[in-house]
Amino acid sequence: SIKAAVEEAHKNDKQLLVDMIAVQDLEKRAKELDEMGADYIAVHTGYDLQAEGQSPLDSLRKVKSVIKNSKVAVAGGIKPDTIKEIVAEEPDLVIVGGGIANADDPVEAAKQCRDAIEGK
């Protein structure tokens, strides 16, 4: 269970990130995970939802509004041209995958994302 994983991670001085891809009731589940002691709660917009035009912004805002202790990570659909609006919401961790890996110039895409995160 997630609770057992959190306990085991903390017992070994490690942190645990829980990915909430495909979770329907984000606020409810985020509160539960926060109470369980998850170190990071990740909002993650999958490819299918990205294809429908969804971004992780709304999910990020919802989760940040209900948690008290956990940090927030965000993933899914983040690219150099969208990362600034994500960073403006001040997540604790930004995960960029396809936005770099699938870019015409992955090195430049990574640099642009890093610059946005560092406020450059």
Could you describe each region identified by the protein language model?
Residues 1-13, 24-31, 48-64, 79-84, ...:
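Active-site-adjacent beta->alpha loops and helix N-cap segments on the catalytic face
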Residues 12, 36, 88-90:
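Structural motif
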Residues 12-14, 69-70:
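A short helix->loop->beta-strand "cap" motif at the edges of active sites that frequently abuts
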Residues 16-20, 41-43, 72-76, 94-96:
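Hydrophobic faces of well-ordered beta-strands that scaffold small-molecule active sites
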Residues 38, 43, 56-64, 71-75:
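Alpha-helical membrane segments in multi-pass integral membrane proteins
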Residues 41, 86, 97, 113:
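Conserved, mostly hydrophobic/aromatic
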Residues 46, 99:
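Flexible loop residues that form catalytic
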Residues 115-119:
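C-terminal alpha-helix
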